[in-house]
């Protein structure tokens, strides 16, 4: 009985430094790069490389802000805890629930992408069927224990990293050995209408989709409560992940866009698979499709982990039903995994009803939730830093360029929202932000009223 109580509300610290680095890396190397980059290439051309560098810098600032807070206070629920403690109870409530919804939407987008990748081999299989099968498999794995999740995500991410590095090396060899055919040349980066064929506007208009690619880096913060040694592992993961991401994103896209003119890229297929398919290398195209499928499953796996831990943190704060604040004897928050899975299952229905537009719609909703998420991290960090300065505390892992870095991030978020308002198909998700904030407000008032009623009794 004592043992049951001891484990009743505690997550196990079963994640090592290698797990944490690859969870964050795996969270970012996914559908945004492998599938989302297609529409960016069509609009921005080779300028996509500059776009990823800009968004990568913003993502790094956000990660360092979150990293500073997490190293000081490694807790479940990550930044919703900081918003709650340093900003106010509504901020904690809103940021936590927004993050949970964000990752439910990301999970839906990744499952949709899985369906598209399966169609590369089996065009007759509807996306909703593939989504349903992998939905069941990944959730079943997450119901084991955190170390199994960590190991699986570690190997998923290793496959992605090796594949991206191998693709950069193999693509480079094709490029410089002359085996890539007459169209393979570094001059493709500026010959087809210039580096920015549609001007700087073409690139700016794509920043929202590029931002989608970097969503997932903040998973480092969520892992803190289950990290063996957060004071060492979080700073190391934060600093190393961003350099690797930029090398992978910028390196792979530079090689890719040199192998073939950017004008040949189509929106529905991964440009990585398409280019090797067009070069006539069916083996590499098939191998890469396995990799992009693994990438989507890896991010979905991270989503299942992340959603359940965020909901667990919300329940511990009293912002979600108390039943969700329990774990089984292995330290697995089974209830939160099942609740998150139930909502994510809507993805199968969306793919059944609107298979063609499902991915675009989900991606737009993800970016809106991500804007709220990153803005709240930046704002919560400013309040956290002020509180620490007033207490005379010198933090161990200070964020870069504080407070200027925070204002740069907030300006970037505002620009992304304006871009989305001007983008057909994306504007609806921006209009939904005030609606979503009202829903959160009603939920918060209901929670407060219920809490008061319980106290009165």
From Swiss-Prot:
Biological process (GO), any one: amino acid transport
Signal peptide stretch: none
Transmembrane segments: 20-40, 43-63, 87-107, 118-138, 156-176, 202-222, 241-261, 272-292, 334-354, 359-379, 408-428, 430-450
Membrane topology, as annotated: Multi-pass membrane protein
Keywords: Amino-acid transport, Cell inner membrane, Cell membrane, Membrane, Transmembrane, Transmembrane helix, Transport
Compartment(s) of residence: Cell inner membrane
Keyword presence, ATP-binding: no
Superkingdom of this protein's organism: Bacteria
Topological domain spans for side Periplasmic: 41-42, 108-117, 177-201, 262-271, 355-358, 429
GO cellular component, one term: plasma membrane
Entries under Gene3D superfamilies matching the protein: Amino acid/polyamine transporter I
Family assignment from sequence similarity: Belongs to the amino acid-polyamine-organocation (APC) superfamily. Amino acid transporter (AAT) (TC 2.A.3.1) family.
Biological role stated in the UniProt entry: Permease that is involved in the active transport across the cytoplasmic membrane of all three aromatic amino acids, phenylalanine, tyrosine and tryptophan.
Protein's name in the database: Aromatic amino acid transport protein AroP
Gene name in the database record: aroP
């Amino acid at each position: 009985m004592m043992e049951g109580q001891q484990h009743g509300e505690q997550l196990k610290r079963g994640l090592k430094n290698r797990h944490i680095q690859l969870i964050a890396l795996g969270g970012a190397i996914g559908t945004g790069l492998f599938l989302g980059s297609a529409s960016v290439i069509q609009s921005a051309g080779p300028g996509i490389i500059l776009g990823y560098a800009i968004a990568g810098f913003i993502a790094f600032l956000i990660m360092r802000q979150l990293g500073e807070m997490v190293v000081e206070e490694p807790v479940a629920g990550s930044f919703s805890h900081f918003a709650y403690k340093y900003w106010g109870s509504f901020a904690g409530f809103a940021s936590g629930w927004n993050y949970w919804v964000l990752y439910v939407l990301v999970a839906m987008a990744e499952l949709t992408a899985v369906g598209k990748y399966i169609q590369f081999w089996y065009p007759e299989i509807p996306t909703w069927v593939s989504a349903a099968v992998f939905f069941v498999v990944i959730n079943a794995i997450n119901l084991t224990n955190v170390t199994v999740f960590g190991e699986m995500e570690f190997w998923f991410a290793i496959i992605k990293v090796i594949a991206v590095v191998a693709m950069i090396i193999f693509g480079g060899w094709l490029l410089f050995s002359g085996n890539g055919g007459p169209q393979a040349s570094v001059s493709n980066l500026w010959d087809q209408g210039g580096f920015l064929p549609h001007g700087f506007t073409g690139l700016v208009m794509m920043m929202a989709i590029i931002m989608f690619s970097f969503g997932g880096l903040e998973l480092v913060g969520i892992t803190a409560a289950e990290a063996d040694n957060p004071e060492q592992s979080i700073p190391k993961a934060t600093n190393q992940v961003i350099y690797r991401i930029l090398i992978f994103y910028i390196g792979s896209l530079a090689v890719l866009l040199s192998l073939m003119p950017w004008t040949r890229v189509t929106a529905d297929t991964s440009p990585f698979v398409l280019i090797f398919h067009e070069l006539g290398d069916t083996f590499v195209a098939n191998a890469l499709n396995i990799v992009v499928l693994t990438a989507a499953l890896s991010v979905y796996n991270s989503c299942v982990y992340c959603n359940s831990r965020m909901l667990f943190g919300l329940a511990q704060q009293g912002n979600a039903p108390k039943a969700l604040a329990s774990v089984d004897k292995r330290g697995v928050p089974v209830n939160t995994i099942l609740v998150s899975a139930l909502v994510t299952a809507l993805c199968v229905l969306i793919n059944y009803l609107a298979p063609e537009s499902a991915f675009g719609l989900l991606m737009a909703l993800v970016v809106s939730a991500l804007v709220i998420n990153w803005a709240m991290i930046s704002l919560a960090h400013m309040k956290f830093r002020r509180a620490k300065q007033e207490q005379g505390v010198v933090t161990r892992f200070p964020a870069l360029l504080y407070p200027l870095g925070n204002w740069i991030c907030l300006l970037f978020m505002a620009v992304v929202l304006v871009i989305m308002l001007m983008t057909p198909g994306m504007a609806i998700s921006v209009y939904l932000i005030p609606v979503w904030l009202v829903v959160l407000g009603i939920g918060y008032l209901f929670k407060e009223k219920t809490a008061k009623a319980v106290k009165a009794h």
